[in-house]
């Protein structure tokens, strides 16, 4: 038994069919594009951490005010 109940021979047949359908040139370019995308993602993640500015916490403010009761409108029956 191989991966998930699939034998090595079945995996090789699937790989052969994929190569025959897409061709080696297209698979090579697809792998290259995928690798470039992963490198770009990692680079942007590293740059995001390095360039992240320090976040300043807003300072609390105290407001001096007096509470007063607001008149409520008369209820209509």
Curated annotation (Swiss-Prot):
Recorded name of the encoding gene: tatA
For this entry, the protein name equals Sec-independent protein translocase protein TatA
What are the UniProt keywords, alphabetically?
A: Cell inner membrane, Cell membrane, Membrane, Protein transport, Translocation, Transmembrane, Transmembrane helix, Transport
Q: Which organism is it from?
A: Ectopseudomonas mendocina (strain ymp)
| Bilayer-crossing regions | 2-22
Q: Which GO terms describe its molecular function?
A: protein transmembrane transporter activity
| GO BP term, pick one | protein transport by the Tat complex
Family label = Belongs to the TatA/E family.
Which portions of the chain have biased composition (kind: Basic and acidic residues)? 46-59, 66-77
How does the protein associate with the membrane? Single-pass membrane protein
> What PANTHER family does the record point to?
SEC-INDEPENDENT PROTEIN TRANSLOCASE PROTEIN TATA (PTHR42982:SF1)
What is the first-listed, main subcellular location in coarse terms? membrane
Question: InterPro entries from the entry?
Answer: TatA/B/E (IPR003369), TatA/E (IPR006312)
Q: How does it assemble?
A: The Tat system comprises two distinct complexes: a TatABC complex, containing multiple copies of TatA, TatB and TatC subunits, and a separate TatA complex, containing only TatA subunits. Substrates initially bind to the TatABC complex, which probably triggers association of the separate TatA complex to form the active translocon.
Q: What is the protein's known function?
A: Part of the twin-arginine translocation (Tat) system that transports large folded proteins containing a characteristic twin-arginine motif in their signal peptide across membranes. TatA could form the protein-conducting channel of the Tat system.
Keyword Oxidoreductase appears in the UniProt entry: no
Q: Where is this region: Disordered?
A: 46-77
Q: Does the keyword Aminoacyl-tRNA synthetase apply?
A: no
Q: Enumerate the subcellular locations listed in this protein's record, separating them with semicolons.
A: Cell inner membrane
Q: Name one GO cellular component term.
A: TAT protein transport complex
- A Pfam family reported for this protein in Swiss-Prot or TrEMBL: TatA_B_E
């Amino acid at each position: 038994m191989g991966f998930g109940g699939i034998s090595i021979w079945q995996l090789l047949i699937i790989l052969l069919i994929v190569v025959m359908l897409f061709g080696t040139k297209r698979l090579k370019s697809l792998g290259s594009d995928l690798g470039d995308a992963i490198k770009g993602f990692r680079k942007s993640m590293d740059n995001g951490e390095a360039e992240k500015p320090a976040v300043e916490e807003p300072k609390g403010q105290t407001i001096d005010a007096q509470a007063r009761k607001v008149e409520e409108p008369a209820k209509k029956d």
